[in-house]
């Protein structure tokens, strides 16, 4: 799987005057899992990217096992925007994946209502830190498995849930970060999850 998106969203889409609700969503996961690609594929505006070319200085510091062909890395965050309907807008922040930039995550989580954890099953261990930090911040999240063509294992969702020790209430779905409709389905799943959590709190309070 490359990072080229197969469906291009409309660019320079104006924000609807009727938009009432803006939600900050963070996309997290390991290096090379597809965070920048996801933000790029679903954003209705030209996304802000802070990608830089990887240099020799990162050799021995950055873990590139399984993504050796990747030549750029996000050094701050990606930003995009998508309107799910006339009244709800999601502001997307893609977190940097390299371990040396993880200190930025806690700042990105400030004011976040929900998150997407992208998982690459070739590098499953890279997902642990993201899940741990979100649980620490008590930030609701969904897990999206970005399938790669060269993954020899092709684990089932149930196997992935067990490997990550995900509770049953945490949504777990497949996705293709390159495809706009697939990425949008992930975000809709997250919004529905947030709504269900809010309804549960309301009925139990």
Regions of interest found by a model, annotated:
Residues 98-123, 132-137:
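Inter-motif core of Ras-like GTPase G domains
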Residues 26, 142-143, 171:
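A structural signal for isolated positions on well-ordered beta-strands in alpha/beta enzyme cores
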Residues 92-95, 115-121, 143-147, 174-176:
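Conserved beta-strand segments of the P-loop GTPase G domain that flank and frequently precede/overlap
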Residues 18, 74, 83-85, 106-111, ...:
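Conserved catalytic network of the ASCE P-loop NTPase/AAA+ motor domain
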Residues 2-67, 71, 81-91:
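Conserved G1/Walker A P-loop phosphate-binding module
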Residues 126-128:
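Active-site-adjacent beta->alpha loops and helix N-cap segments on the catalytic face
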Residues 149-205:
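Canonical P-loop GTPase G-domain recognition
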